[in-house]
Structure formats: structure tokens, C-alpha cells
Amino acid sequence: LKPLHTDQTFDFVFLDCPPSLGILMINALAAADELLTPIQCEYFALEGLVKIVRLIEQVLDSGANERLELGGIVMTMFDSRTNLSQQVVADVRKHFGERVYETVIPRSVRLSEAPSFGKSILEYASSGPAAQAYRALAREFMKRHGSPATVRELSHTPASENRET
């Protein structure tokens, strides 16, 4: 990835890793400038976040990547109807402050269905709450990074095809 640092073609390169702390994640952290990590609004997600912070410290201590930092935390699978979701968000914000994005990604049936159709949520249910949240997240990410880029709004398909349940 080193050539990408000097190549002005790309503003950002995202390395999307599986949700494990294995060798793929370690290699991605060795190559990354910062980590943007999704955290589910679930009790055990807090333990996972602690493990991620420790892994970042290990990468820094090993000398594999001295630039690496925890750049942001995105709260996902948020259900506003539950106290648990609200409490997890509050706890993570208390401990990590500004690193936690304001945008939260809601729990959504459509979001769960999209991969089984080989589509992103922006393609599968472009006008639904989850797609709107991901657009808001992209705008917030670019604002935080001072990027002049804009979020490309995908054309909306008829609302009847996009209704989230």
C-alpha cells in the first residue's frame, strides 16, 4: 500500500476486514494510518472494543506501524427502542469521546437482507433509514477528514421497493 500514500488518485483506501482479530486484521493495521471500527450496540461489543484498543497498542509497540491510531468508532445495529442500545452508545461515548461518530447505523431487516442479494444497502434499499444513515456517516467521515469530496447520492428507486421493515 505504500505507493498509494504518494498517489494522488485516492483520497482514502478502506481495508474491510472480517470481524476477528486474526492475521488479516493485524496486517491491515500494519498498513493503515487509522482504524475506523464498527461496534454493535450489544453488551459484549464493549469487550471487543477493549481488545481492539489493545491490538492497536501491540501494533504500535511492535514497530510495525507507528502511524496507526484509532480514528473513529461507528455504533451499529442501534435499536432506539431498547435501553441496552442507548446505554452502550452512552458508555462508548463516555470512554472514547470525539472518536465516536454522531451517526449511528440502525438495526434493519433490509440491511441484513442486502448482502444475500449481492447488493449494498444503497442499492438494495436506497431511501430507507439504513441507507440514509450510511450516507450521513460518509458525510461525517469526509467532514472530519477535511475532504472536499462529496457523497454521491444514488438515484432512488420507487419507495415501495425500498420500504424497510
Where are these regions (language model features)?
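Conserved catalytic-core segment of NTP-binding enzymes
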Residues: T6-V109
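C-terminal lobe/tail of nucleotide-utilizing enzymes
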Residues: D61-T165
